[in-house]
Amino acid sequence: MGAAGSSALARLGLPALPGPRWLGVAALGLAAVALGAVAWRRARPGRRRRLQQVGTVSELWIYPIKSCKGVSVDAAECTALGLRSGHLRDRFWLVIKEDGHMVTGRQEPQLVLVSITYEDDCLILRAPGMDQLVLPTKLLSSNKLHDCRVFGLDIQGRDCGDEAAQWFTSFLKTDAFRLVQFEKNMKARASNEIFPSLDKNYQVAYPDCSPVMILSEASLADLNTRMEKKVKINNFRPNIVVTGCSAFEEDTWDELLIGNVEMKKILACPRCIMTTVDPDTGVIDRKEPLETLKSYRLCDPSEKSIYKSSPLFGIYYSVEKIGSLKVGDPVYQMVQ
């Protein structure tokens, strides 16, 4: 049955039994897999493709406020705009300057020290030397609407109030800041504005480029074999972490099924100076791990017009079919 079959039995709370009893359990497991595959094919009658398991979900992350710490979750909905757990939405909050321009860890590296928990429909924000901030996830419609700029594109956000603004201003101590929230009735940023040269069709709120980013544990482990000072998964801020595959195997995954969510590859994730911010100290290095990645993860020369000199690490995906997923779910590549 192999490791994958044994882990499936463990998730069901069943021991891996020897002899005929084991065969009976295995038969039940195979039947369940077959029924699931049949159900998937029936749900997608026009797309006759087979499923090839390429890994397993080991971690799920939602980053409510852009550049602040992520929240690890066991399960999530996957919407067209990214992961969601209750009122926690991925990159639905954004720190801005008073003129509306976004502020990220690239400009204010200490943002990565802001931790977030979720209680009673509120985000609870904590940071070194600061009292906690209780932030309601449902804002008054009378709160001001800001016209914001995210990577040169216009997008709106609703002001989270003076208390939140003062909290971030006091913590960062470099400028006057506001916090805004994206709302579902607002116009998101369109893929044809983000990547005009690519034939893609999706939208995002405040993420850099895509609703979902996937990275494998093996790719991180490979990078760390080349690093004097090891880096963490938090340096790269993926939404979905995959185990059970080889390093950089995710480069080859074009279309995925996880839980009942279907995703389609947009492009590889070009890495920037944000990866050099230490998630534990908020100190920006400006060199590593970026320099090491550049030594072996640059794009093919034919793709330089897209990626330029940025090293590639992780993959951006659009959500083709919304649904739910959880830690422990198999990751299937959908192949012809």
UniProtKB/Swiss-Prot annotation:
Question: InterPro entries from the xrefs?
Answer: MoCF_Sase_C, MOCOS_middle, Pyrv_Knase-like_insert_dom_sf
Cofactor notes: Binds 1 Mo-molybdopterin (Mo-MPT) cofactor per subunit.
Q: Which GO terms describe its biological process?
A: cellular detoxification of nitrogen compound; nitrate metabolic process; nitric oxide biosynthetic process
**Could you tell me the membrane topology recorded for this protein?**
Peripheral membrane protein
PTM entry text: Ubiquitinated by PRKN during mitophagy, leading to its degradation and enhancement of mitophagy. Deubiquitinated by USP30.
Entry GO MF terms: molybdenum ion binding; molybdopterin cofactor binding; nitrate reductase activity; nitrite reductase activity; pyridoxal phosphate binding
Tell whether Membrane is among the UniProt keywords: yes
GO cellular component labels: mitochondrial outer membrane; peroxisome
Q: What is its EC number?
A: 1.7.-.-
- Tell me the cofactors it needs: Mo-molybdopterin
Where is the protein situated, by its record's location annotation? Mitochondrion outer membrane; Peroxisome
Alphabetically ordered keywords of this record: Isopeptide bond, Membrane, Mitochondrion, Mitochondrion outer membrane, Molybdenum, Oxidoreductase, Peroxisome, Transit peptide, Ubl conjugation
Q: Which reaction does it catalyse?
A: N(omega)-hydroxy-L-arginine + 2 Fe(II)-[cytochrome b5] + 2 H(+) = L-arginine + 2 Fe(III)-[cytochrome b5] + H2O
Instruction: Give the transit peptide range.
Output: 1-35
**Glycyl lysine isopeptide (Lys-Gly) (interchain with G-Cter in ubiquitin) cross-link, chain position(s):** K138, K144, K173, K187, K287, K294
Share what the entry says about its subunit structure, partners included: Component of a complex composed of cytochrome b5, NADH-cytochrome b5 reductase (CYB5R3) and MTARC2.
Q: What's its job? A: Catalyzes the reduction of N-oxygenated molecules, acting as a counterpart of cytochrome P450 and flavin-containing monooxygenases in metabolic cycles. As a component of prodrug-converting system, reduces a multitude of N-hydroxylated prodrugs particularly amidoximes, leading to increased drug bioavailability. May be involved in mitochondrial N(omega)-hydroxy-L-arginine (NOHA) reduction, regulating endogenous nitric oxide levels and biosynthesis.
Protein name, please? Mitochondrial amidoxime reducing component 2
Q: Which species is listed as the source?
A: Bos taurus (Bovine)
Q: What is the lineage of its organism?
A: Eukaryota, Metazoa, Chordata, Craniata, Vertebrata
